[in-house]
């Protein structure tokens, strides 16, 4: 039975039983604490936690969820049961049926006849486990289902009691195992041999409330839940392994085709030895996981999800090399795994080209460094062993990472294969030093000095109270003054200083929003604030010029925000949120923010996406954004707990460190809801027009949109309109006809250029006919050493040389033709077949000429070309060529 049929039978079984079929969620959810969806119940957590009401008609649902677990990537292939990507088929009940219903449903599907839509498993080969004290489940299995008592085994909390690891719902579980037979191990059930007895289904009975505690079995159970729920998970790949009667999950119809392709590409047979088999399984597993991650929008990177994907793809590449592959292999692996997975995930077909491009690009980038990096490691390993050591120094591991892009995980793998350890502490120390230097450089740029310890007393004792959400002018006290990184007691006119206030309405740069501009006032004293930076998350540092008067520590002042600056900054920041929401509408939920910067009237927004946006997509994003502006939605903010914000549906960015209290900015209800600490307009209409300037790539898998907002947008659009009107006037055409008229002009220009090029070539050929008259005979070789008219390009020189060579026919002939082209000296060398037979070699002659004119080049024996920079050396070069021909 093929895997896609197993999936269909599972879904049909539960739909026929009244469950609502729910499509698999993306592997990427808006949860900053979750790298990937790693269990079938994850998308249903809000319903189990009581944060949302289940929207399913009968209170029951079924899904086959994509899952990725990457805790033990290096163990993949060593064991044959576990995959980094797997499909978890589940049925869920929210206060409807409980233990008996869950057990009956699972047993009916597993043992039901194939003709009736079941899997047809032999009931005599099924074993079950229950929690130690769960007499109810044990009785259902024995009395209602008919499983003999000797095939029902009881296990403790660590094995058969489920919780989320935090306070919340929990309960006992019951697992179903399949006996694969005596060839796989000893008898005695799952407690005796979990290799012979394969777990295929876990039934979780959520009936209790978990309290605080640590681990799987050390927590308090507080009492019963008001509603009892069911969460089950059947391993699709494991059931496929059983129904297809293969040794392990790697030999099912989903993964074995990749292994077959790997055999062909590497010349190594699967099953020949254990080490090779592990590498084959790594290729198969990681190809599927990598492909599915790219499908859901992950791109290779150096941290978070992108780092996991990069690590998987690079392990594929290295495993293929170790098996004997010599060229690129990613295209074949990806094509194969996409073929096997498309029946279950039809969306792969529409994303095939994108998936291939991301994977192959990563392969080509890594192959450039793999050979040299591996060679460096092998040299290091040899010298380490020769010195009687068993440890790779942290500096050596750091060099591999810093110079060749080797992740520490790859170095650890290579070291283990060589019987060595790695000084991970030393590596981490060097990485920390590098980060510290980068941080110091950044601090120096922001503060003019790198020593931030000078701020410690204020950070610890007098953090700044930010008042800028409530007011734009605040009564403040000067707590400190600094100049050139040193504390001072007073500041005088003309001095550049940093001012520490007890409270401030000026926004400090963070979250992509630049710091406010404004003033600090005391009588006639005026300090112009041109930047505000944060130290940590608590202290505001106002960088200011004393424009008039003086200021001392302890003075009572008024801190005032430049209202025009703040208004325009608010416009840009709120526009950033709208553009983010519009992007996700147009491109899908994987277009996640990767960075942003907004300042008055301008914003840029970086997002994870591998494709260049089409003009139509850019226009659609702009239209959705401006429609949101025009709708005049209220911009609401609320401070709440992180858990409550997530329950509300607020978007959080993976990898960000959020405090226990967060600020949610909501625009248009579900249209945009993000965690954000920045300043915003009160209504979306206050943003004014938003004009997208375009989008571009700023790195692998990251693109950038830039836009104007408010008055800047109006001015930009006015200039664009004036430009269009001027062009329309010049072309004597209405504006709406400009694209067509410009296209016509471009076509005419191209036609004229082709005509000019044809005339040029005709003239060139006419001149070429007489050039052989300048040839001389040197030792029986017709030799033409010629500088043609200036600004003849390399292509034309090549045409001249090949034409003249053809004219020489069977004669022995050598041609060297050069030109002075705006300070560069392109040149071509050609030799007839007869001259080559005598010993002439155009490639060698190119190198000879290049040595006289500060140039280089190369090519074949009959034709080569090069370029130099010293036309004055050309005659000497010709003389050297004559000498070479005389010596033939």
From Swiss-Prot:
The cross-references to Pfam families, in alphabetical order and at most eight, read: DHHA1, tRNA-synt_2c, tRNA_SAD
Q: What is its EC number?
A: 6.1.1.7
Q: Which UniProt keywords apply?
A: Aminoacyl-tRNA synthetase, ATP-binding, Cytoplasm, Ligase, Metal-binding, Nucleotide-binding, Protein biosynthesis, RNA-binding, tRNA-binding, Zinc
Q: What SMART domains does UniProt report for this protein, alphabetically?
A: tRNA_SAD (SM00863)
Q: How is the cofactor bound?
A: Binds 1 zinc ion per subunit.
> One biological-process term from Gene Ontology?
alanyl-tRNA aminoacylation
Where it sits in the cell: the answer is:
Cytoplasm
Q: Which terms in the GO cellular component ontology are assigned?
A: cytosol
Task: Give the reactions, separated by semicolons, that this protein catalyses.
Answer: tRNA(Ala) + L-alanine + ATP = L-alanyl-tRNA(Ala) + AMP + diphosphate
Q: What is its main location?
A: cytoplasm
Q: Where are the transmembrane segments?
A: none
- Residue positions binding Zn(2+): 573, 577, 676, 680
Query: Is Transcription regulation found in the keyword set?
Result: no
Instruction: Please list the cofactors this protein needs.
Output: Zn(2+)
Q: Entry's Gene3D superfamilies?
A: 2.40.30.130, 3.10.310.40, 3.30.54.20, 6.10.250.550, Bira Bifunctional Protein, Domain 2 (3.30.930.10), Threonyl-trna Synthetase, Chain A, domain 2 (3.30.980.10)
A GO molecular function term, named singly, is: tRNA binding
Tagged with keyword ATP-binding: yes
Q: Tell me the function of this protein.
A: Catalyzes the attachment of alanine to tRNA(Ala) in a two-step reaction: alanine is first activated by ATP to form Ala-AMP and then transferred to the acceptor end of tRNA(Ala). Also edits incorrectly charged Ser-tRNA(Ala) and Gly-tRNA(Ala) via its editing domain.
What family, per the record? Belongs to the class-II aminoacyl-tRNA synthetase family.
Quote the record's domain comment: Consists of three domains; the N-terminal catalytic domain, the editing domain and the C-terminal C-Ala domain. The editing domain removes incorrectly charged amino acids, while the C-Ala domain, along with tRNA(Ala), serves as a bridge to cooperatively bring together the editing and aminoacylation centers thus stimulating deacylation of misacylated tRNAs.
NCBIfam families with a match to the protein in the record: alaS
| Protein name (record) | Alanine--tRNA ligase
Per the UniProt record, the lineage of the source organism begins with: Bacteria, Bacillati, Actinomycetota, Actinomycetes, Mycobacteriales
This protein's gene is called alaS
């Amino acid at each position: 039975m093929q895997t896609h049929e197993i999936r269909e039978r599972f879904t049909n079984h539960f739909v026929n039983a009244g469950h609502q079929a729910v499509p698999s969620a993306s592997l990427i959810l808006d949860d900053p604490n979750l790298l990937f969806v790693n269990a079938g119940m994850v998308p249903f957590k809000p319903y189990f936690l009581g944060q949302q009401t289940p929207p399913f008609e009968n209170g029951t649902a079924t899904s086959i969820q994509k899952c990725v677990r990457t805790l033990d990537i290096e163990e993949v292939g060593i064991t044959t049961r576990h995959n980094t990507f797997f499909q978890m088929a589940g049925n869920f009940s929210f206060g409807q049926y409980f233990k008996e219903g869950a057990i009956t449903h699972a047993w009916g599907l597993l043992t039901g006849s194939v003709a009736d839509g079941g899997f047809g498993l032999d009931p005599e080969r099924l074993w079950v486990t229950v929690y130690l004290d769960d007499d109810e489940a044990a009785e259902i299995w024995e009395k209602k289902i008919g499983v003999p008592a000797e095939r029902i085994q009881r296990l403790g909390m660590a094995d058969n009691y489920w919780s989320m690891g935090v306070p919340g719902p929990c309960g006992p579980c019951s697992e179903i195992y399949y006996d694969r037979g005596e060839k796989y191990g000893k008898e005695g059930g799952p407690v005796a041999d979990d290799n012979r007895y394969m777990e295929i289904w876990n039934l979780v009975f959520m009936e209790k409330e978990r309290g605080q505690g640590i681990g799987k079995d050390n927590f308090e159970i507080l009492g019963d839940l008001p509603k009892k729920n069911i969460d089950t998970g059947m391993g699709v790949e494991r059931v496929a392994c059983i129904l297809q009667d293969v040794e392990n999950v790697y030999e099912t119809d989903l993964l074995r085709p990749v292994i077959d392709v790997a055999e062909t590409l590497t010349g190594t047979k699967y099953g020949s030895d254990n080490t090779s088999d592990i590498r084959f399984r790594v290729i198969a597993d990681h190809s599927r996981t990598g492909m599915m991650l790219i499908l859901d929008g992950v791109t290779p990177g150096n941290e978070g999800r992108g780092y996991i994907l990069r690590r998987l793809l690079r392990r594929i590449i290295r495993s293929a090399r170790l098996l004997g592959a010599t060229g690129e292999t990613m295209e074949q692996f990806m094509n194969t795994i996409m073929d096997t997975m498309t029946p279950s995930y039809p969306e792969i077909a529409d994303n095939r080209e994108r998936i291939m491009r991301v994977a192959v690009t990563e392969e080509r980038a890594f192959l450039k460094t793999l050979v040299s990096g591996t060679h460096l490691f092998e040299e290091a390993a040899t010298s380490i062993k020769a010195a009687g050591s068993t440890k790779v120094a942290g500096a050596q591991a750091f060099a591999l990472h810093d110079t060749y892009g080797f992740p520490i995980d790859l170095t650890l793998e290579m070291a283990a294969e060589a019987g060595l350890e790695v000084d991970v502490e030393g590596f981490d120390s060097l990485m920390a030093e590098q980060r510290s230097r980068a941080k110091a450089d950044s601090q120096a740029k922001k503060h003019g000095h790198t020593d931030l310890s000078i701020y410690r007393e204020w950070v610890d004792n007098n953090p700044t109270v930010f008042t800028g959400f409530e007011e734009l002018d605040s009564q403040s006290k000067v707590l400190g003054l600094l100049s050139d990184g040193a504390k001072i007691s007073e500041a005088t006119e003309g001095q550049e200083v940093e001012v520490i206030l007890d409270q401030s309405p000026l926004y400090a740069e963070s979250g992509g929003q630049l710091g406010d501009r404004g003033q600090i006032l005391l009588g006639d004293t005026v300090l112009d604030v041109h930047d505000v930076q944060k130290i940590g998350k608590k202290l505001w540092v106002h960088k200011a010029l004393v424009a008039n008067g003086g200021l001392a520590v302890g003075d009572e002042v008024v801190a005032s925000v430049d209202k025009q600056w703040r208004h325009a900054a608010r416009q840009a920041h709120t526009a950033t949120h709208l553009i983010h929401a519009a992007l996700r509408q147009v491109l899908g939920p994987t277009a996640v923010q990767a960075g942003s910067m907004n300042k008055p009237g301008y914003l840029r927004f970086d997002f994870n996406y591998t494709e260049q946006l089409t003009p139509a997509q850019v226009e659609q994003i702009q239209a959705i954004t401006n429609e949101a502006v025009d709708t005049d939605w209220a911009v609401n903010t609320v401070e709440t707990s992180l858990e409550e914000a997530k329950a509300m549906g607020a978007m959080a960015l993976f990898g960000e460190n959020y405090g226990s209290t967060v600020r949610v900015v909501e625009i248009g209800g579900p249209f945009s809801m993000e965690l954000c600490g920045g300043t915003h307009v009160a209504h979306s209409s206050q943003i004014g027009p938003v004009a997208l300037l375009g989008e571009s790539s700023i790195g692998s898998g990251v693109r950038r949109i830039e836009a104007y907002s408010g008055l800047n947008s109006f001015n930009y659009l006015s200039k664009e309109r004036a430009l269009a009107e001027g062009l329309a006037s010049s072309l004597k055409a209405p504006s709406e006809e400009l694209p067509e008229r410009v296209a016509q002009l471009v076509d005419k220009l191209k036609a004229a250029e082709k005509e000019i090029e044809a005339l040029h070539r005709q003239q060139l050929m006419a001149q070429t006919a007489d050039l052989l008259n300048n040839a001389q005979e040197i030792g029986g070789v017709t030799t033409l050493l010629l500088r043609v008219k200036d600004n003849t390009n390399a292509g034309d020189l090549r045409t001249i040389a090949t034409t003249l060579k053809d004219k020489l026919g069977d004669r022995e002939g050598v041609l060297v033709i050069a030109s002075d082209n705006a300070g560069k000296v392109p040149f071509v060398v050609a030799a007839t077949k007869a001259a080559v037979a005598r010993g002439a070699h155009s490639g060698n002659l190119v190198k000879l000429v290049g040595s006289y004119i500060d140039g280089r080049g190369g090519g074949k024996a009959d034709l080569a070309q090069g370029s130099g920079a010293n036309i004055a050396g050309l005659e000497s070069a010709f003389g050297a060529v004559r000498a070479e021909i005389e010596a033939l």
